[in-house]
């Protein structure tokens, strides 16, 4: 081993033993060039370091190995990274969260290129758990995990990291990029869409769209298109975006989504044949955007919406009559829709198989059972917790030096502009 590398190993050992993590971070940041020049000796360096005791030193070596233009032996490197992430010291790597996250990004990109996304899911879950200060903290690795789950069509491993509400962002020593925030909510929205949890999907797309921005982001544009479609499926109309949405959405993103606005406009007429014509007209656009599946679900949701409207007019109706009123192909298709809607709790009805008549019923829920009271209690607890969090955040902002300085400055400006009451 070259003397400079020996010195690096000795310094890593010494600083780790002394617990001087800040100085150790400075060392590994300076040593990138040295490690890159001695690529053939890096496995020897890894052998001289203990993953648990010298986590930051091992991290630096693996990061450099992955940064090379071509990885000579990917399988060996993959095994080394897998072992490192599962056994490294979480307290140590939190001093170099930027490098640790960077290693995870490199691993993700390599697996995406090799079309092996499934292999990285378990590793990234461990990485997030090591890096997070708490379960409500968002890291840039969250977006990587969601991307791999989407590509592998294996959604459930991501759910524990999507079902929690994020209250904090890991700064990653200033390396956290807005792209990771947008990707987390965009990919998360796609996962929820795939699982047909449209309510949560809509929330995730909204987070991506309403992210403060000064320029158009392609991720925000794609989120906006899916937001329109999921809105129609879930609510039967496009949900209005909050007032704090950036002006670029109205100025630039909306004009780039004309086909989707036309779709929403035609959807509001409740006419399935017109909607089908519009889908055919813009089929190339919807297919190019990979949204044709969602568009078809919009058409299906319009049929359901029209069936729901019939429940407000009729007590009983034949399947044949329903099919003609809703513009379905025949009584068989009408029966299929009604059965699915009964199963999903979208309507309350029964079908008489003898005469093909559908009888509509009132909602049997009386809202007086223990389960309903438990749900109300849970919702109230969430509201209390949210109120406490808001108070804590308000207090945090109130004592923030930058906020105090700005508010004092604005008060001085106001007092300076007021005419004196004494003459």
Swiss-Prot record:
Record has Phosphoprotein as a keyword: yes
Subcellular location field: Cytoplasm; Nucleus
Modified residues (Phosphoserine): 407, 410, 423
Record-linked InterPro entries: COP9_N, CSN3, CSN3_C, PCI_dom, WH_DNA-bd_sf
Region feature Disordered, mapped onto this chain: 402-423
Role description: Component of the COP9 signalosome complex (CSN), a complex involved in various cellular and developmental processes. The CSN complex is an essential regulator of the ubiquitin (Ubl) conjugation pathway by mediating the deneddylation of the cullin subunits of SCF-type E3 ligase complexes, leading to decrease the Ubl ligase activity of SCF-type complexes such as SCF, CSA or DDB2. The complex is also involved in phosphorylation of p53/TP53, c-jun/JUN, IkappaBalpha/NFKBIA, ITPK1 and IRF8/ICSBP, possibly via its association with CK2 and PKD kinases.
Subunit structure: Component of the CSN complex, composed of COPS1/GPS1, COPS2, COPS3, COPS4, COPS5, COPS6, COPS7 (COPS7A or COPS7B), COPS8 and COPS9 isoform 1. In the complex, it probably interacts directly with COPS1, COPS4, COPS8 and COPS9 isoform 1. Interacts with CK2 and PKD. Interacts with the translation initiation factor EIF3S6 and IKBKG. Interacts with ERCC6.
Record-given protein name: COP9 signalosome complex subunit 3
Gene: COPS3
């Amino acid at each position: 081993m070259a003397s400079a590398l020996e010195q690096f190993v000795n310094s890593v050992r010494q600083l780790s033993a002394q617990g001087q993590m800040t100085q150790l971070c400075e060392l590994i940041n300076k040593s990138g060039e040295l490690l890159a020049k001695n690529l053939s000796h890096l496995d020897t360096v890894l052998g001289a370091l203990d993953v648990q005791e010298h986590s930051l030193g091992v991290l630096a070596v693996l990061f450099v190995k992955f940064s090379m233009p071509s990885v000579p032996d990917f399988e060996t490197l993959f095994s080394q990274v897998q072992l490192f992430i599962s056994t490294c010291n979480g307290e140590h790597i939190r001093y170099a969260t930027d490098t640790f996250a960077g290693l995870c990004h490199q691993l993700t990109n390599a697996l995406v290129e090799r079309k092996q996304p499934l292999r990285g899911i378990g590793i990234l879950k461990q990485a997030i758990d090591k890096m997070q200060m708490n379960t409500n903290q968002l890291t840039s690795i969250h977006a990587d995990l969601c991307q791999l789950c989407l590509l592998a069509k294996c959604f459930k491993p991501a759910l524990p990291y999507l079902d929690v509400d994020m209250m904090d962002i890991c700064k990653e020593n200033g390396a956290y990029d807005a792209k990771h925030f947008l990707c987390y909510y965009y990919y998360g929205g796609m996962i929820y869409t795939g699982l047909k949890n449209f309510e949560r999907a809509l929330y995730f797309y909204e987070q991506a769209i309403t992210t403060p921005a000064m320029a158009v982001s392609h991720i925000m544009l794609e989120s906006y298109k899916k937001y329109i479609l999921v809105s129609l499926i879930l609510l039967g109309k496009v949900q209005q975006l909050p007032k704090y949405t950036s002006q670029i959405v109205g100025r630039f993103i909306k004009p780039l989504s004309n086909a989707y606005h036309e779709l929403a406009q035609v959807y509001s007429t409740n006419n399935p044949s017109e909607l089908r014509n519009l889908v055919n007209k813009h089929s190339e656009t919807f297919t190019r955007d990979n949204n044709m599946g969602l568009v078809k679900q919009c058409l299906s949701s319009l049929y359901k919406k029209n069936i729901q409207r019939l429940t407000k007019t009729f007590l009983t109706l034949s399947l044949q009559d329903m099919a003609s009123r809703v513009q379905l192909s025949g009584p068989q298709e009408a029966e299929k829709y009604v059965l699915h809607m009964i199963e999903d709790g979208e309507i309350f009805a029964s079908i008489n198989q003898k005469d093909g008549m559908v009888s509509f019923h009132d909602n049997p829920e009386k809202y007086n059972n223990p389960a309903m009271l438990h749900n109300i209690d849970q919702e109230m607890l969430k509201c209390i917790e949210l109120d406490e969090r808001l108070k804590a955040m308000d207090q945090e902002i109130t004592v923030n030096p930058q906020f105090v300085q700005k508010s004092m400055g604005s008060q001085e400006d106001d007092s300076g502009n007021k005419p004196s009451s004494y003459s």
